[in-house]
Swiss-Prot record:
Record protein name field: Dynein light chain roadblock-type 2
Similarity annotation: Belongs to the GAMAD family.
Naturally occurring in which organism (per UniProt): Mus musculus (Mouse)
A Pfam family assignment: Robl_LC7
Alphabetized UniProt keyword annotations: Cytoplasm, Cytoskeleton, Dynein, Microtubule, Motor protein, Transport
GO cellular component, one term: cytoplasm
Record note on quaternary structure: Homodimer. The cytoplasmic dynein 1 complex consists of two catalytic heavy chains (HCs) and a number of non-catalytic subunits presented by intermediate chains (ICs), light intermediate chains (LICs) and light chains (LCs); the composition seems to vary in respect to the IC, LIC and LC composition. The heavy chain homodimer serves as a scaffold for the probable homodimeric assembly of the respective non-catalytic subunits. The ICs and LICs bind directly to the HC dimer and the LCs assemble on the IC dimer. Interacts with DYNC1I1 and DYNC1I2. Self-associates. Interacts with DYNLRB1.
Length: 96
């Protein structure tokens, strides 16, 4: 098992985690624990939102960069960890 697979398995085992996915720089999912339609929807929308958030952070301070994005709604909490080539996305129940 690769280090990436071990990390994803460890994250997925946390209480309340609904799903995890890794998305490439173009917004295409390359690893997921969710069904296909949910994965495609989340990957596309969160990729756009993350790119906009990165751009906003840089517009405010060109020396700065987005390191983590957390979105909490009534139903879910979505955490995005952007890297140069990938996004790690974790969806969990907010009450846990």
């Amino acid at each position: 098992m690769t280090e990436v697979e071990e990390t994803l398995k460890r994250i997925q085992s946390h209480k309340g985690v609904i799903g995890t996915m890794v998305v490439n720089a173009e917004g295409i999912p390359i690893r997921t624990t969710l069904d296909n339609s949910t994965t495609v929807q989340y990957a596309g929308l969160l990729h756009q939102l993350t790119m906009k958030a990165k751009s906003t952070v840089r517009d405010i301070d060109p020396q700065n960069d987005l390191t983590f994005l957390r979105i909490r709604s009534k139903k879910h909490e979505i955490m995005v960890a952007p890297d140069k080539e990938y996004l790690l996305i974790v969806i969990q129940n907010p009450c846990e």
